Amino acid sequence: MSPSPVNTSTEPASVAAVSNGNATASSTQVPENNQSDSFAPPSNNSQQNQQSSTIAPNGGAGSVANANPADQSDGVTPSFVGSLKLDYEPNPFEHSFGSTASVGQGNPSLNRNPSLSNIPSGVPPAFARTLLPPVSSIASPDILSGAPGIASPLGYPAWSAFTRGTMHNPLSPAIYDATLRPDYLNNPSDASAAARFSSGTGFTPGVNEPFRSLLTPTGAGFPAPSPGTANLLGFHTFDSQFPDQYRFTPRDGKPPVVNGTNGDQSDYFGANAAVHGLCLLSQVPDQQQKLQQPISSENDQAASTTANNLLKQTQQQTFPDSIRPSFTQNTNPQAVTGTMNPQASRTQQQPMYFMGSQQFNGMPSVYGDTVNPADPSLTLRQTTDFSGQNAENGSTNLPQKTSNSDMPTANSMPVKLENGTDYSTSQEPSSNANNQSSPTSSINGKASSESANGTSYSKGSSRRNSKNETDEEKRKSFLERNRQAALKCRQRKKQWLSNLQAKVEFYGNENEILSAQVSALREEIVSLKTLLIAHKDCPVAKSNSAAVATSVIGSGDLAQRINLGY
């Protein structure tokens, strides 16, 4: 293996080599302006723990090569000198693929890091970093969280999102906003950790390293997930906008535990939850079904906590009856037109605005509207007896919804229907109780579609009478409408005539006034002309009139006519 290029430095430093998992500090102090360190990068994973010592040009392993500064001064350039501080930065990938036991536990050199203990004070604290753990530790939820001597997880605040209790996947989007939170460190009171964060991380490019900005991403370079994505996947921030009652509750019914050393990091998904994003995605259809179905089962109380909280929150809000939400959507058409089963009504819990319609004849209101107890149509519907007809036919269908003015009574007149039959009242029992006719429009636009109260259909002379009466009513209504239209027309005509007469009077008076003004002005003009003619030979009048004519109008034929008086 050929030695790496030799670098020069203006500051004294010491280099430590780690070999076979044991910390062997073979540092050699060199005079100022005469130090040169050379590192041989590890070739592969098998040679990391066997050969990590420095190789000098003379072939001595574990020693620092002392070269002549005169031999190195020719190859030193300003750009090469700017990257000298990379020599003091430890290689974070030397022990990345080591065993878990050798990281932080079996290898005490990683805790105290002797290679960084003797770095002079001139080196920035950003390079005093611990090494990365193996990949197997990165995939675990709590990586090096309890390791002694480590204030911040991994020593890199930008990578601290891997150690969060809600993080179970190193590629999870929750790392995006990890550095934006004030609790990204397990121990924010540690001054060294705060100093390391303020001075940059080992993966953050420095002032003289602009070429590394595109090669080394950090957690702060990614945007934070949107609120909808964060709520769906469970990546809640600690300053969540939702109340505590909407947080995730584990299956055992226990409240969320407090995780972390500060006591302010609440674990929304439990300490033992694995791959919480997929778990929440699998629970979204279940929660939607719980909201749509009646909440009557109390066997799994912990699982339905979120649904109950949402239902209570909605019921506390006040909505108008037209926009009131319904959590129990009933898709059965017979539930609206059929009778309510007492047992089904006990098991199915409906909102309060449905309960008002169940106390009247056992019928819920159509389309979920609120039923008014003082409604006369409801009283008439409740007093109508349908038990005899239902007993004869064996059917449980209720009559269609009608208004108070549309219900046939004993004193009502026969109404013409579309199929040629008419409604006539009689005391005879109905021969065909199931005979139904399509609803037609009467004066109010509605008619009953079912025979009730012992009414029956009759044909013959009554139909002719009803037809004649219907035509007479139509004729009367037509004449009445014509009379009303003629009356309105006459009223509009009178109004137009009155307005026209008022305009005529106004313009006549104005014309008289203007005529009087014209006459007065003419008289004044005549008097002025008379005065001018009487004083046309006066020298003062001539001079004054000439001066006025010259200054105001100007010299010309008009001025001469003014002077002459005409």
UniProtKB/Swiss-Prot annotation:
Basic and acidic residues bias locations: 466-479
One term of GO molecular function: DNA-binding transcription activator activity, RNA polymerase II-specific
GO BP terms, alphabetized: activation of reciprocal meiotic recombination; negative regulation of adenylate cyclase-activating glucose-activated G protein-coupled receptor signaling pathway; negative regulation of antisense RNA transcription; negative regulation of reciprocal meiotic recombination; negative regulation of transcription by RNA polymerase II; positive regulation of transcription by RNA polymerase II; reciprocal meiotic recombination; regulation of transcription by RNA polymerase II
Entry's Gene Ontology cellular component terms: atf1-pcr1 complex; chromatin; heterochromatin; nucleus
Cysteine disulfide links: none
Residue spans of biased composition, Polar residues class: 1-42, 65-76, 97-106, 379-412, 421-460
Low complexity bias locations: 43-53, 107-117
Protein name, UniProt field: Transcription factor atf1
Organism: Schizosaccharomyces pombe (strain 972 / ATCC 24843)
Gene behind the chain: atf1
